[in-house]
Structures are given as structure tokens and as C-alpha cells.
């Protein structure tokens, strides 16, 4: 009998050292076994892991350990998404070089990750800021360039004049830079873009085949790609009201059926027609300047008050030359979508209705719901966007929406103006090409040279990587690469003249769009991938990460894989066969009377007759228990993983993260439940030790027959094995843990019996204990290794095969059925599992509860749902 209590603090580092010394998690690329690639989204090296990391990486580790035990060649690597703005901010605020800050953080976080006991192949580790990594990224940039997947184009960008950098739409808040607070300017700048739109339809169509992705993620990508079928219409402009040189206004609409309900046209502030009109209208120019000050993100525009300015320009209705529509500049029309212009049909679009109600333009319903009298159908404050038939639409009246769309398209396609059709059927996508230029130092350098004679010249492959200089300063705003006195000055590789390097660096999303492929052979010094290895190990069988990455990261990775295929680096289209989005870890918030947030470690929870009460541990001061929210530093409701591991051990943290909630839902942090997990660890330790003692008289070989007690325990063991196996395969980890607890209770009940177990039961106890340890080994690997040794098993449990299920033990001798009378539950009945319907009916009708419920009424019929319910109808 070993120590009474399990000592995680001593055991966990010891087993981690053994795993490392034996390199048991190293993956061999030439292993003949079937491969299984499990990958969690790699972390940004901020300096500390948070409790959400523990959950994310535990989920993947359970799967990796399980599949390894099932006989797969498991690839489970780890690396670092290491470029990005925080490193530059640290350089500015703390006077430390981005490189030093990043690698120091990596060292600290790697130590933390190791303490969790993850079965990672650390030999494949890399950081995206390693020149040996981004060398290959630069190579692929040039390959994509040659394949026509990279271009340089003028783009309107958000320019922060203080930080002197381009901001993403999401970084513009109320018209100001998120960090500097400066009023953001709109500028035209040369930007490098990846031509993701070449794959718009393919990226959309392929979503149907990603059947192991969450539906919500596929829907988010579908909406982001945003395919829409419609009609491009060329509205003529009234020459009496239009600036010189402007003759028409093109709009794309998905609702050409509503043309006779049009009340206005609206154009973006960036539309050439708006600029032409503003040149001679100071009030319009001022309006355009004002609306550009709001955030340019779609969310900001959607929530802003709808505003417009009548330019005085009139557009001619394509079906009636005497009917003209006012052209407004509106703050809700974006140049990036469609043509930057729309026609407004307020009766059938809520945004348009709000607009006309504000400006008094009126509305005319042109689609009437079925069964409604067209004469009395009016629209006031709520637009009608449902199905119906056309009204108030001349030759379209009485048609369905689909018929009307087709009729409008046919007529406008047939009508010519200036040698071209007035209407053209088109497919549009919301997806835009991916602008990757960033005016930042800490990113992957873009491998091109600008020569006054030769224009843009790719850096020769022999000169890669273009390495970031270390001797940079951040003493003035803007891009440190641009300020560097020597780095950007080079000789043109084409003509030998003076030239300059590109000083923009790549968007950090590029770094994470192919790292999964690099993990397949990170030792290849000459190419981004070793194709035969990548094609064998890819795609990732199970990818795990937050839903916040559902669109950009996952969509960019899907594009990048296709681009890598087009340039010969991989052979597959999709990078991730399975995608799982885990929930967050959330926690109560605690506040003092003055509203100051307090860290949970400083709070003591007292439970009494009046419920839960929180006090400040140091002073006894009452603390308000606030709502359960996402962990954040600002609300101080964070938990330090190091503290939990130090206090309870990694296995307790892992078990808690898996136990309370389905893994795709948020888990509420609870100190009480963490303590419950710690108690369960000790209980398992005692059960295993007691099983060893109880099994001392067990025969060395399997008994020929088993008595009822031994058979019942074996059924419980193999039933749990079957349920946990299926649960892990379906990623239902919390359900697996419930089955493990249930099985542990069954074993404990047998061990609690005072009588010495018979030899067959002693053998069954040893088997049950071994299966129990193997079942919890993916979740609590350190405890499992310790228990494995106590059981006298050779080697490491991390290298052991998953136990085989004896299917004949899963067949139940009896089954318990719910009994209903006229649909209301009246009791239960237990019958032989192979009982026929007449036997079941007899047993049910003999029940006193059934006789009482029938109260002498004759039985009309008995409905039997096999192995579930019997309903007596009286």
C-alpha cells in the first residue's frame, strides 16, 4: 500500500521529466500507422498563459492522448504567433526591444504550458518571428506574386496622423485612433493585397463539405463571403442637375422587383459623383467631412443615425423617363460594397424607410402579402420584407417576386443606351481582397525592392530571408523600418542602381495562415513544406480554438491553403477537416462599495441562511457579488493558472476544465468545484490502492467463469469504457467525466463490502481498476501514471494501448421501462431484455399502480416503445 494521499506537487514534475527524457510524444513522419493531427490555435506570447489557455489546450490534449492510445501516429505540435503590435508597444512603454520582449515571454509561457502536462511534440516548436520561419513566408509571397495572387493597388485607408500608421476599421472608434486618440484621416495609399476574391465561389461552395465544422462558424463564413445574385442597373442622370462629365449612376440591387417603389438614390461619400458634386457645394463638402468622422467599421455605420444630403442631382427611372429620383449622399452607403450606390425602396427595406421618414420622401408599397387587400395595404413605420405579389408596379402587377425580378432583368437587358445594356445580371460578393500591408516594424518584411528604374522588383530567392534589423528605435511616431538609416537602402538586383526596400510588413494574420502546414516538417531549410510529408499529415484532423476566429483566421487559412496548392506547396484545398470552438472561462465579479473591482483571490465567500455573502479577506469589508462575466484584467475576475497548479496540481485544473460544461459552452469558474475536483483526485488514488489490496488474491489468469458480483462489476467497467470511448470521439468530455464518476462509484461500492472478495471478483476488481485508470488517463495523465505504477503495470500509461471493449458484456440481461397510463407516468417495470411484447404487457397490467389508474376501465391498447416506454391506453 502506497502513501495515503496523492502528492501532485511531487508527482507531476517527475512524470513530465520522464515523458521528456523518453521523447514519447515526438512524432515520426515516416511512421506507417494512420495519422491523426490535432492542433489548438497557437498562442500569442503575451508573457503569461491565462486560464482559457488551460481549457483550450486540455481539450486538445485529451484527444491527442486518446488517439495515441488508439494506435494513431498523433501529431500534436506547439508554436508561437509571435509578431504583432503589443511587442512594439512594450518597446515604447518599457524601453525593451520587441525581439527580447517576445522571446522572454515565450520562455516564460513555455514553462507554464509544460506544467500543464500537455503531450506536445516540442521538437517542432517555432515562433513566427524566427527568420527561419518567415523566410519561407517571404518565399510563398513571391510564389503567390508570380501566380497572380498578390497585387499592389491604391486603396483608401484609415490613417492615424499621430501614430503614422494605417488602422483597421475596427481600430477606429468614434472617428479617432484607438491608441492615439487622433482624428483619423482617409488616405489613398499603395497597399499589398492577396487576391482572395479569386476563390470567393470556391470558398463558399466548399463550406458544404466541412461537415465537422460547427454550423454557426460555417454560417458566419457564408455571410462574410456574402454571395448575392442581382442586377446591375445603369441609371441615366438628368443632365440639367448633374456635374459636367457625369452621365450615369450604376447600382447593384438584389431587389430589382421593387424598382417602382424607388423614392431616392443614395451614394457613398467616397463615390466619384459625390466628390464631383462636393467640389462646387461647400455644404455638401462639409457634410461629407463630418460623416467620415464616424467609425468606418460596418458595425459603427449600422448603429449610427441615418443621415443624408440632397445633392440636387436627379436620376432617371429606367422605365419612365419623366420620373426622376433625388440623389443623396448617405452615411450608410459604403464604397466597398457593390458600386457604392443604391436605390432606396422604403416600403420594403427598414433602413430606407427610416431614411425617407426622416426626410419626408414618402413610400409606395410594391409587394403585398398574400391575402391582403392591395387597396388598404400601407406602410408606416415597419417595412415589409416578406413574400407576396407585386402591386403599384405597372406591368409587374400580380407577379411573384421571382417573376418580377426576372421580368425587370429581361427588359433592362434588352434596352440599350450608349452601346451597352441598361441592365446586366451579376453575382456579387461581400468578400474583399485581403490588404496585408502594415506600417509596423514587428512583422514579416515584405520581400520586394522599389527601384526608380525597374519599379517593383522581387527580392531574389537566394537573398531570403529579408531579416528585420535589431538596431531600431521607437523615439518618433511611424514605422521604425522607414526611419532606419541604412536598412532600407539597397542595390536593385535587376539594374544595380540605388533602390529601397519595402518598409511595410505583413499583416500578422498571414503568419497564422499556414503555420499548421509548417509543423509537418519544420526542419526543411529550403522550402516552406516538404510536399509528400505535408500531404500525408494534412489536413488537420481536429482544430480547436475560439469562435472569435471563426471568420478572419479560418477564412484566410482556407484561402492560403488553396494558394499553397496553386503554387505546389500542398495538394489539399482545406486545412482543417474538423473544427471545434470551445467556450470561455467566466467568473463572478466582485466590487467594493466605491465600485472598485476586487480580485477573487482577495475575497472570501461565506454561505449562510441568507445565501452567499462575499467579504474582503483582509478587512472583513462587505463585497458586492456581481454578474458572471468573461475573465478580464479590467474587472479583476481572473484566475492565475500558476496559483491553481501550485495549490492543487495540473490534473485538478484539467479535470475541472472538462467537467462542468459541454466544451463548446462557457465554464463558470468556481473555487468550490475546483476543491471538489481535488477531492475526487484523492478518491481515485484511494480507490486504486484499495483495489490493489482487494485484488491480491486474484488469479494470474482470467477465470473461466464469473459469478454475479464479478460479472456485474465487469459490465460496469466495460459499459463505462464504451461510453467514455464514444464520448471522447464526439468531444463530449463532460459526459465522459460523468461516466467515470459513475464507474468509480460502482467500484467503490464493491470495495466497501466487508467480505473478502472471491478470486473471480478479485480479478474483476483488478481489471476494473486498470480500466478506470486508463479512462481518466487522457484527462489526468500524471495521476494515471502514478496509479499505473501502483497497479504494477509495466512502462508508461502514456504509451499503453486503449483497452478493448468486450461487447458481450454490454448486453443487458434486463431492461427497465417507464410505464404510463394515458400518457401519464405511473411507475416502472423491469423485464428481461429479450422479453416479447405479450410478456411485457402482462407484467405492466399486473402492476397495482396501473390497475389503480385504470379504475376498472377496459384496456383499449398497449403501446410499447422498445427498451423505453410502455403506454397503456384505457
Curated annotation (Swiss-Prot):
Transmembrane regions: none
Primary location class: cytoplasm
Stored Gene3D superfamilies: 2.20.28.290, 3.10.20.590, HUPs, Isoleucyl-tRNA Synthetase, Domain 1
Domain of life: Bacteria
Binding residues for ATP: 633
A single MF term (Gene Ontology): leucine-tRNA ligase activity
Enzyme class label: ligase
GO BP, sorted A to Z: leucyl-tRNA aminoacylation
Keyword flag Ubl conjugation: no
Catalysed reactions, semicolon-separated: tRNA(Leu) + L-leucine + ATP = L-leucyl-tRNA(Leu) + AMP + diphosphate
Placement of sequence motif 'HIGH' region: 43-53
Matching PROSITE patterns: AA_TRNA_LIGASE_I (PS00178)
The family this protein is said to belong to: Belongs to the class-I aminoacyl-tRNA synthetase family.
Alphabetized NCBIfam families for the sequence: leuS_bact
HAMAP family for the chain: Leu_tRNA_synth_B (MF_00049_B)
Protein name: Leucine--tRNA ligase
Record organism: Bradyrhizobium sp. (strain BTAi1 / ATCC BAA-1182)
Amino acid at each position: 500500500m502506497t502513501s495515503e494521499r496523492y502528492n501532485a506537487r511531487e508527482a507531476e514534475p517527475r512524470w513530465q521529466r520522464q515523458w521528456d527524457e523518453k521523447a514519447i510524444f515526438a512524432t515520426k513522419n515516416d511512421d506507417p500507422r494512420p495519422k491523426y493531427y490535432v492542433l489548438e490555435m497557437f498562442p500569442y506570447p503575451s508573457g503569461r498563459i491565462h486560464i482559457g489557455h488551460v481549457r483550450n489546450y486540455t481539450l486538445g490534449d485529451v484527444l491527442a492522448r486518446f488517439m495515441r492510445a488508439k494506435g494513431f501516429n498523433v501529431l500534436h505540435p506547439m508554436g508561437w504567433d509571435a509578431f504583432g503590435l503589443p511587442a512594439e508597444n512594450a518597446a515604447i512603454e518599457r524601453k525593451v526591444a520587441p525581439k527580447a520582449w517576445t522571446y522572454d515571454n515565450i520562455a516564460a509561457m513555455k514553462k507554464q504550458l509544460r506544467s500543464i502536462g500537455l503531450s506536445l511534440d516540442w521538437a517542432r516548436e517555432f515562433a513566427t518571428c524566427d527568420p527561419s520561419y518567415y523566410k519561407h513566408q517571404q518565399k510563398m509571397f513571391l510564389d503567390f506574386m508570380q501566380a497572380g495572387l498578390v497585387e499592389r493597388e491604391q486603396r483608401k485607408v484609415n490613417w492615424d496622423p499621430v501614430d503614422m500608421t494605417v488602422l483597421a476599421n475596427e481600430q477606429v472608434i468614434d472617428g479617432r485612433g484607438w491608441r492615439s486618440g487622433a482624428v483619423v484621416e482617409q488616405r489613398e495609399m499603395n497597399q499589398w493585397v492577396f487576391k482572395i476574391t479569386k476563390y470567393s465561389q470556391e470558398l463558399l461552395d466548399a463550406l458544404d463539405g466541412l461537415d465537422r465544422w460547427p454550423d454557426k462558424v460555417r454560417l458566419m463564413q457564408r455571410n462574410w463571403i456574402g454571395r448575392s445574385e442581382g442586377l446591375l442597373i445603369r441609371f441615366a442622370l438628368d443632365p440639367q442637375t448633374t456635374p459636367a462629365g457625369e452621365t450615369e449612376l450604376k447600382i447593384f440591387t438584389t431587389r430589382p422587383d421593387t424598382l417602382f417603389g424607388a423614392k431616392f438614390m443614395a451614394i457613398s461619400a467616397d463615390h466619384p459623383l459625390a466628390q464631383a458634386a462636393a467640389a462646387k457645394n461647400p455644404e455638401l463638402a462639409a457634410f461629407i467631412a463630418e460623416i467620415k468622422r464616424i467609425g468606418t467599421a460596418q458595425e459603427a455605420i449600422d448603429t449610427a443615425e441615418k443621415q443624408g444630403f440632397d445633392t440636387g442631382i436627379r436620376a432617371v427611372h429606367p422605365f419612365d423617363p419623366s420620373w426622376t429620383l433625388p440623389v443623396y449622399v448617405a452615411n450608410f452607403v459604403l464604397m466597398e460594397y457593390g458600386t457604392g450606390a443604391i436605390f432606396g425602396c422604403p416600403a420594403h427595406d427598414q433602413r430606407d424607410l427610416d431614411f425617407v421618414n426622416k426626410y419626408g420622401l414618402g413610400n409606395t408599397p410594391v409587394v403585398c402579402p398574400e391575402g391582403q387587400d392591395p387597396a388598404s395595404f400601407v406602410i408606416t413605420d415597419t417595412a415589409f420584407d416578406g413574400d407576396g405579389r407585386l402591386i403599384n408596379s405597372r406591368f409587374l402587377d400580380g407577379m411573384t417576386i421571382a417573376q418580377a425580378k426576372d421580368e425587370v432583368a429581361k427588359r433592362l437587358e434588352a434596352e440599350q443606351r450608349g452601346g451597352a445594356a441598361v441592365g446586366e445580371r451579376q453575382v456579387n460578393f461581400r468578400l474583399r481582397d485581403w490588404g496585408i500591408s502594415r506600417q509596423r516594424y514587428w512583422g514579416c518584411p515584405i520581400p520586394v525592392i522599389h527601384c526608380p528604374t525597374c519599379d517593383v522588383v522581387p527580392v531574389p530567392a537566394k537573398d531570403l530571408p529579408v531579416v528585420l534589423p535589431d538596431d531600431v528605435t521607437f523615439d518618433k511616431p511611424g514605422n521604425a523600418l522607414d526611419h532606419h538609416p541604412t536598412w532600407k537602402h539597397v542595390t536593385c538586383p535587376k539594374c544595380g542602381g540605388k533602390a529601397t526596400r519595402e518598409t511595410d510588413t505583413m499583416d500578422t494574420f498571414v503568419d497564422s495562415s499556414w503555420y499548421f502546414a509548417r509543423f509537418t516538417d519544420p526542419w526543411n531549410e529550403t522550402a516552406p513544406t516538404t510536399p509528400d510529408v505535408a500531404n500525408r499529415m494534412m489536413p488537420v484532423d481536429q482544430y480547436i480554438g475560439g469562435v472569435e476566429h471563426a471568420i478572419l483566421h479560418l477564412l484566410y487559412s482556407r484561402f492560403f491553403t488553396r494558394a499553397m496548392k496553386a503554387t505546389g506547396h500542398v495538394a489539399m484545398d482545406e486545412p482543417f477537416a474538423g473544427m471545434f470552438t470551445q467556450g470561455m472561462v467566466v467568473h463572478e465579479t466582485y466590487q467594493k462599495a466605491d465600485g472598485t473591482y476586487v480580485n477573487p483571490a482577495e475575497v472570501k465567500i461565506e454561505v449562510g441562511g441568507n445565501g452567499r455573502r462575499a467579504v474582503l479577506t483582509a478587512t472583513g469589508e462587505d463585497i458586492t457579488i456581481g454578474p458572471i462575466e468573461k475573465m478580464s484584467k479590467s474587472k479583476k475576475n481572473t484566475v492565475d493558472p500558476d496559483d491553481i497548479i501550485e495549490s492543487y496540481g495540473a490534473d485538478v485544473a484539467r479535470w475541472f476544465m472538462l467537467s462542468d460544461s459541454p466544451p463548446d459552452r462557457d465554464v463558470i469558474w468556481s473555487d468550490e468545484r475546483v476543491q471538489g475536483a481535488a477531492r475526487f483526485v484523492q478518491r481515485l488514488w484511494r480507490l486504486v490502492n484499495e483495489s490493489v489490496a482487494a485484488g491480491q488474491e486474484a488469479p494470474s489468469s482470467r477465470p473461466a467463469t464469473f459469478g454475479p458480483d464479478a460479472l456485474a462489476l465487469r459490465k460496469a467497467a466495460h459499459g463505462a469504457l464504451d461510453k467514455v470511448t464514444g464520448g471522447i470521439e464526439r468531444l463530449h468530455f463532460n459526459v465522459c467525466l460523468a461516466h467515470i464518476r459513475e464507474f468509480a462509484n460502482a467500484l467503490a461500492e464493491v470495495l466497501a463490502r466487508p467480505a473478502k472478495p472471491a478470486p473471480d471478483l478479485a480479478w474483476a476488481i483488478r481489471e476494473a481498476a486498470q480500466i478506470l485508470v486508463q479512462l481518466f488517463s487522457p484527462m489526468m495523465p500524471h495521476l494515471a501514471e502514478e496509479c499505473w505504477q501502483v497497479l504494477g503495470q509495466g512502462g508508461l500509461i502514456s504509451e499503453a494501448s486503449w483497452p478493448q471493449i468486450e461487447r458481450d458484456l454490454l448486453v443487458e440481461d434486463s431492461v427497465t421501462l417507464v410505464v404510463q397510463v394515458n400518457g401519464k407516468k405511473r411507475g416502472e417495470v423491469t423485464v428481461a431484455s429479450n422479453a416479447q411484447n405479450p410478456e411485457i404487457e402482462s407484467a405492466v397490467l399486473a402492476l397495482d399502480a396501473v390497475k389503480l389508474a385504470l379504475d376498472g376501465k377496459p384496456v383499449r391498447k398497449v403501446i410499447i416503445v422498445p427498451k423505453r416506454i410502455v403506454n397503456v391506453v384505457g
